[in-house]
Structures are given as C-alpha cells and as structure tokens.
Amino acid sequence: MAKRVTGPEIEKLIQLLAKVPGLGPRSARRAALHLIKKKDQLLGPLSHAMGEAYDKVKICSRCGNVDTVDPCTVCTDGHRDQSVIIVVEDVADLWALERAAAMNAAYHVLGGVLSPLDGVGPDDLNIRGLIQRVGEGGVREIIIAVNATVEGQTTAHYITDQLAGLEVKITRLAHGVPVGGELDYLDEGTLTAALRARTAI
C-alpha cells in the first residue's frame, strides 16, 4: 500500500478533480499540484468562481440550457429566430453548435437520449417540454441534432412520432463524409449515411 504524502484536504482535491471528465488520477494529481503552486493566481479565483457558479447556476425552465438567469440568455435573445428550434442531447452539444455559429436559432436540451437498457425512458427526458413549446405555436421547424448512435436515432424517431399532427417541419442533421475526410478512411455505416443523405449540386 502506497504511503500518503499529502494531507486529507489535498487528497480530497485530487479525488474530486479525478471525477471531472477527461481527468484520470494522474492528470488530477498534476492539476491539483499546479493549482496549489499557483494558489493566488489560480486556486483562489477558481474556488471563488466555483462558489459563485454553485450559488447562481440554474437550468433554464424553457429550453434546459445552463445559465445564471431563467429563462436563459439564449431564450431571451431577441435577435434569434425563435421559430426554429435545434434539439440537442446535452448542453455541451448546444455550446458546440454555438461555437460553429452556423445558425441563429433557439435550442431545446433533452438531457440525454432514450436508452431502455439504462432505464432511460421518455419521462426522464425533456421531451414533454419540447412538445409544449411546439404546441404554443410560432415554431415552423424542429432540427433534431442528436448523436448518430442507436439511442440517438431511437430518440429522433420517438420525437418525430410525438410531433406528428402538429404543423411543424422536422429535419435532422446530415450524416456522412466530414469536411476534409477521405472516403477510404470512412466506415461502411458513415458511407451509407452519406450516400442516403446526398444532395444536388
């Protein structure tokens, strides 16, 4: 058994950092050591920022985004096209689409995907909120932007079925050849999706 070389406070910091996605035990130790070495420049301000986030962060009651105000900044942005809603699995997907700056639409965060094996059903996701938003009127298009996994496709089909009968256009992100990708390196599933989603030139 390895000997302890730090106090319990530092060990706790390392253990908590190791729970952050992308950080394993070794990376967490390095991060903790770096924070401690830069106590005034990093550890103090980080501790303060985390305390503020803990106190102020909330989930938007309209779209499911994470913000310090409710409704969130995206929902209250008067320059956005609120008639187009992009449906995403998670807040990280919303942020990724915003970085791409390809559309100035509204969003709806599901909070995951349908996964019967993991016990995740429709009531565990924010699907009812989406149906309510569409039912209120003013929405002309729903863009389903979930991951191209079996669970993602199942979720997309379920949402499409639930929105049937409402006057709204339903589209999904195209799947296939990435920009700069070479056909020889793509798997069969990706090539099949690309062929099926082909567009006119």
UniProtKB/Swiss-Prot annotation:
Chain ranges of zinc fingers (C4-type): 60-75
UniProt entry tagged with the keyword Zinc-finger: yes
Pfam families per record: RecR_C, RecR_HhH, RecR_ZnF, Toprim_4
Family according to the record: Belongs to the RecR family.
Source organism: Rhizobium rhizogenes (strain K84 / ATCC BAA-868)
Record keywords, A-Z: DNA damage, DNA recombination, DNA repair, Metal-binding, Zinc, Zinc-finger
GO BP terms, alphabetized: DNA recombination; DNA repair
Domain Toprim as annotated: residue spans: 83-178
UniProt xrefs under SMART domains: TOPRIM
PROSITE patterns reported in the protein's UniProt record: RECR, TOPRIM
Protein name per its UniProtKB record: Recombination protein RecR
Signal peptide: none
